[in-house]
Amino acid sequence: MPTISQLVTTSRQDKNYKSKSPALHYGFNSLKKEDSEYNSPQKRGVCTRVTTMTPKKPNSALRKYARVRLSNGTEVTAYIPGVGHSLQEHSVVLVRGGRVKDLPGVRYHIVRGALDATGVANRMQGRSKYGAKRPKAAKKK
């Protein structure tokens, strides 16, 4: 524990926390041709590659992911949630933060139901997370 005189000479330093989704924390100013720091909840991007990946040890599957070039120029790997998708190269998508625990290097999710990423078809529960509209038959009077 520091003494009073030690605290007088050098005050306590705040801890610097490293971001878990760094690509969402800055933008590109095309007029000045430089990065500017600001946080955004999502960013738009263009898919450069859409393919599958196998997860880490205890799990087994073919997880769908896309390589996305964001509007700030960064290229990130983003997971495509839900069953089935219509994404291909040059699709415009919305990317949010959030890692996939069993896929190394995947720190972002693609938002379903926004831009070119269509919502999951025939989804009845948890629809808001997958961009699925409320079915006509289930509407109340």
UniProtKB/Swiss-Prot annotation:
SUPFAM superfamilies: Nucleic acid-binding proteins (SSF50249)
InterPro entries (alphabetical): NA-bd_OB-fold, Ribosomal_uS12, Ribosomal_uS12_bac
GO molecular function list: rRNA binding; structural constituent of ribosome; tRNA binding
Stretches with biased composition (Polar residues): 1-11
Keywords attached to this entry: Methylation, Ribonucleoprotein, Ribosomal protein, RNA-binding, rRNA-binding, tRNA-binding
Cellular component, GO annotation: small ribosomal subunit
Modified residues (3-methylthioaspartic acid): 102
Single GO biological process annotation from the record: translation
Family designation: Belongs to the universal ribosomal protein uS12 family.
Listed PANTHER family: 30S RIBOSOMAL PROTEIN S12 FAMILY MEMBER
Function: With S4 and S5 plays an important role in translational accuracy. Interacts with and stabilizes bases of the 16S rRNA that are involved in tRNA selection in the A site and with the mRNA backbone. Located at the interface of the 30S and 50S subunits, it traverses the body of the 30S subunit contacting proteins on the other side and probably holding the rRNA structure together. The combined cluster of proteins S8, S12 and S17 appears to hold together the shoulder and platform of the 30S subunit.
Name of the protein in question: Small ribosomal subunit protein uS12
Organism, scientific name: Acholeplasma laidlawii (strain PG-8A)
Lineage: Bacteria, Bacillati, Mycoplasmatota, Mollicutes, Acholeplasmatales
Gene from which the chain derives: rpsL
